[in-house]
Amino acid sequence: MNLPNKLTMLRVILVPVFMVFAACSRYGTADFNPTFALIAGIIFAVASFTDFLDGYLARKNNLVTDFGKFMDPLADKCLTTAAFIYMVACGICSPVVLAVILFREFAVAGVRMLAAETGTVIAANMWGKVKTVLQMLTVLFYYFAAALAGPTDVMAVGLITQLLCWLCGAATVLSGGIYLWQNRKLFMQAK
């Protein structure tokens, strides 16, 4: 396994570690622990950075693999979906946004499965990357702002995060629609 693929797998491994610290932060309760929120944010930042780094190293060193094309977007989905599930549980993100994100990810996974049947590997497109970056920035804003905000800033952090979540939902619909349209031939060829 090459280094970019190891970085992708590290991102997958960091997901449960991130979730433990996110849960221990207990956002939205009287027991909120900003230290755990900050640690969760740092872990998420490191995991997000591996997304940039693995792609950069793979392209720069000609280490692009089918495994990487498949696992990199899957690792992103694991990381961002886990974070959004927790934000919904805390009441920060609308369940509608999470449903849109999950629907898009399952639809894209279905297209990838259809493509695999024909021996085609579909790499992530630019719009999917924009969506992923926006989702990651939203999560990073939430954890760092929640950890660093004073008691009077909590409401503002929540409102800004909710707005960013809706923006993520819109970007998710756009990227999913473009992805499905670009790969519509696969539906026509499906048996």
Predicted feature locations:
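Alpha-helical transmembrane bundles and membrane-interface segments of multipass inner-membrane proteins
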Residues: 1-191
